[in-house]
């Protein structure tokens, strides 16, 4: 479905009369606290996307037959707002998040949205909630845009009506206990996505499908699952809910986007920085056997994941079948450290953004 024509909709604002106390930014967790307000907008067949509004954070009332509850027609995004040492608030590549949201919409038969308007609306919401952007080191305001199908109907088809909403949550430092490597388990019993499916969409079903394998990995003492392709079950795709990189000899390798791998914004940022720094950066298919062989020959130097929540997640141990290998002697490697520092320095305004990635919201 095509996006509606570009026009400036007026956002109505209703402020809460019961503001919540601000949390202690030095003791934040993840995804449990929410700000005073949220953004809502509806899609109606006769009007398109309409009725944009900022209003008090509140439950969404739904008919028990609402289609999203039965068939999972929904998409979402995840990004963060950061407070700099100067007190300004900024976003990291938000336009790319909204481009990806529309890509997900196309795959889920959801009407696309005006990306410029979404950014304007987000800036207005964050400006209202700026006191909720925490100032403690490495904390941030997590942003969750979501679209759900809202027709009360039990037939299997695309909905005619939708709700777009954005909620905000102050979150603590991801590496509160230190920037340490994780242990990952390679699974051949389960797949995250298949060719021709919706693996590249950010849709709830992809995450629900990962829960069982993830739970089994945790029971075995591993942090994440390393996903292989759903056809031959030998080519690496993602790790947990992140993209993944391998450093073999002097080459940085990331699995090529193939329709079942999410278009990670942090992944794209790592690739851009690697090229800027003149590293040998390759996007291609890479098999688990190649990784194991490169470790055996002493060529596997580092493995790390990339994503919005962790930014960079170094891997210190990997289990495949009966083989358990240590990577970088179980320590954080220099590549992972450099990418993590470079990205977080840009996000928090500690270094100048020479890539054009930062959108300043307010001060």
Question: Which residues does each predicted region cover?
Answer:
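Extended Lys/Arg-rich, glycine-bearing segments that form polyanion-binding/interaction patches
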Residues: 24-27, 94-97, 102, 106-220, ...
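Short acidic-glycine loop/turn motifs at beta-strand connectors
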Residues: 6, 42-49, 75, 82-87, ...
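Active-site-adjacent loop/helix segments that line or gate small-molecule/cofactor pockets in enzymes
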Residues: 32-43, 54, 67, 181-228, ...
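Flexible, glycine/charged-enriched surface loops at secondary-structure junctions
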Residues: 114-116, 132-140, 225-228, 278-288, ...
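Conserved phosphate/anionic-ligand binding catalytic regions in large, soluble enzymes, centered on
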Residues: 63-80, 309-313
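Intrinsically disordered, low-complexity, positively charged segments
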Residues: 7-63, 69
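Conserved catalytic-core subdomain
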Residues: 5-25, 33, 172, 184, ...
